[in-house]
Amino acid sequence: MFIGIVSLFPEMFRAITDYGVTGRAVKKGLLNIQSWSPRDFTHDRHRTVDDRPYGGGPGMLMMVQPLRDAIHAAKAAAGEGAKVIYLSPQGRKLDQAGVSELATNQKLILVCGRYEGVDERVIQTEIDEEWSIGDYVLSGGELPAMTLIDSVARFIPGVLGHEASAIEDSFADGLLDCPHYTRPEVLEGMEVPPVLLSGNHAEIRRWRLKQSLGRTWLRRPELLENLALTEEQARLLAEFKTEHAQQQHKHDGMA
C-alpha cells in the first residue's frame, strides 16, 4: 500500500515509519510511506508557505502554490488511482467502517493542514475526501494522519502477526472488545475467569461475545442502536444484563 504525506513536518511521521506495527510493515515492504513538504516547493528565500486570509481575522492560511505543487508531486509518485484526503474537522468522522473502506484503496495521499487551514480552492480542486478523527481542535493534520495510517495499515495482509487480530479488534463487528487476561492466573486476589482456563473453545467464544456485548451496552450503548443483533447475541446480552443487575444489587447490599 502506498501512502503519500503532504506536511510541513514530515519528520513527525517517523513515529509511524520507525516503530511498532506500522514500522514493521514498512520494513517488510508492505507499506510504502513517502512525504513531501510544501516548503520544498516555495520560490522565495524565506520559503514562505502561509499568508494572511482575505477579509481579515486571526491566524494565517497555507498558501495555494506550495501546497498544490506538493500535492501534484505526491500524485506523480503515486501514479493513477490515488485518493487525496485532507484531514479536517469538517470531514467525515473516522470510525471502523470508514477505516475498512479506506483500506480498500491501494494508494492514499494525506494532506495535513496547519495554521488556520488551507485556501478553500485547494480543497475544491485537489481534495477527493475530507476526514476528521473527532470533534476537537488540533494544531495540525499530522496526528490525525498518523491515526488514519495506523488504523488502515492493520487491514493490509501480512501486517499483523495474527490474521484474526484485525477481525477481532474493537469495533470490527460494531462492538467493543471483550476483556483479556494473561499470566499470572491470580493477581492480588483477582482471578482470571475460569472459563478462559477451561479449554472449551465454544464456551470461551460464547463468554467473549457476551462480555463484548455487555461492555458495549455499559460504555457505548449508542453502538447497539445501529446493530441488528442475532438471536444468540440478543440472548447473551439479556444474560449479561441480568448478571450485571445481580452484581449491582449484591454490591449495593454490601455498601
Swiss-Prot record:
Signal peptide: none
Highest taxon of the lineage: Bacteria
Molecular function, one GO term: tRNA (guanine(37)-N1)-methyltransferase activity
Residues reported in the UniProt entry to bind S-adenosyl-L-methionine: G113, I133, G134, D135, Y136, V137, L138
GO biological process, one term: tRNA N1-guanine methylation
Major location category of this protein: cytoplasm
Keyword Cytoplasm listed: yes
GO cellular component, one term: cytosol
Disulfide bonds: none
Task of the protein: Specifically methylates guanosine-37 in various tRNAs.
UniProt similarity note: Belongs to the RNA methyltransferase TrmD family.
Protein name: tRNA (guanine-N(1)-)-methyltransferase
Species, as recorded: Salmonella heidelberg (strain SL476)
Taxonomic classification: Bacteria, Pseudomonadati, Pseudomonadota, Gammaproteobacteria, Enterobacterales
Gene: trmD
